[in-house]
């Protein structure tokens, strides 16, 4: 009889635990769904209004009766997006290329090499993640101005000032270092037996298996460079050097009450980032998971 009571008690506990787990999952799903809805609604309205005519957009309709695809061409032409768009492409491409090279080398050094003060330097690097981006604008601007005086290279109103500050990223180094540390030590031992040094090991062994974190860096690096606005305004005086974010800002003022064209300009600005994300989203998610940064 005692065994029956014990079994019954265990069964009740199991049911209570299952009920608790199910309730917890339901709460998590509800929170996630609410978060997704809050994130999606602004994007949905932007796309929807960009396809409306003026009367529909000012009437706050949710869906266009007849999609006006010509709004995108009209917004592109009126905002003169061609100059700003290709400026942003150049800024993002140069910045991202430099970031991948320098951050990969730095992350590998912190993950696999031994040198005096490594942990202290890495701690300082992580501390920079606490700094707001705006805090770095003044010292970077002073540095750029000084380099323009002491070197023959023109920095202001030129690609160096627009791209080099984006090539250093503590966040990128953190992600890559976390991944590099998870690579089995046996691979390094085997590479040493084959006579490989650190550079050959990095190029032939580490990088081929680091596609996921690399794509994560590509997403964050491209998005940061593409969306930059304040820094380009500081180091340029001519619109001919400014990115598409500046073009959108200027167009929002010029378009005035033409809500549909303003939304079309916003979609044009967002499109490259969205396309890139959908191309590499699988590797991006894997990179976040493997880096140990998932929530």
Task: Enumerate the predicted regions with their spans.
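Short, Lys/Arg-rich, polar N-terminal cytosolic tail immediately upstream
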Residues: 1-21
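A structural signal for multi-pass alpha-helical bundles of membrane permease subunits
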Residues: 24-295
């Amino acid at each position: 009889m005692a065994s029956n009571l014990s079994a019954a008690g265990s069964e009740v506990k199991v049911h209570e635990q299952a009920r608790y787990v199910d309730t917890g999952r339901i709460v998590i799903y509800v929170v996630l769904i609410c978060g997704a809805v809050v994130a999606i609604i602004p994007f949905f309205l932007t796309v929807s209004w960009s396809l409306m005519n003026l009367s529909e957009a000012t009437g706050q309709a949710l869906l266009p009766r007849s999609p006006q695809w010509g709004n995108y061409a009209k917004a592109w032409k009126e905002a003169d997006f061609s100059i700003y768009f290709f400026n942003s492409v150049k800024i993002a491409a140069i910045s991202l290329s430099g970031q991948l090279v320098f951050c990969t080398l730095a992350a590998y050094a912190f993950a696999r090499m031994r040198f005096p003060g490594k942990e202290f330097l890495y701690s300082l690097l992580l501390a920079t993640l606490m700094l707001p981006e705006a805090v770095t604008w003044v010292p970077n601007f002073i540095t750029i101005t000084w380099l323009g005086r002491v070197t023959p290279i023109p920095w202001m109103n030129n690609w160096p000032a627009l791209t080099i500050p984006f090539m250093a990223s503590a966040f990128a180094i953190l992600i890559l270092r976390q991944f590099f540390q998870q690579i089995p030590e046996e691979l390094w031992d085997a590479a040493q037996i084959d006579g490989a040094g650190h550079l050959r090991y990095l190029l032939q062994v580490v990088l081929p298996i680091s596609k996921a974190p690399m794509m994560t860096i590509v997403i964050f690096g491209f998005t940061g460079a593409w969306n930059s606005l304040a820094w380009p305004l500081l180091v340029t005086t001519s619109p001919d050097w400014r990115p598409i974010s500046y073009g959108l800002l200027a167009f929002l003022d010029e378009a005035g009450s033409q809500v549909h064209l303003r939304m079309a300009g916003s979609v044009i600005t967002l499109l490259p980032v969205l396309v890139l994300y959908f191309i590499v989203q699988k590797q991006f998610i894997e990179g976040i998971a493997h880096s140990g940064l998932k929530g």
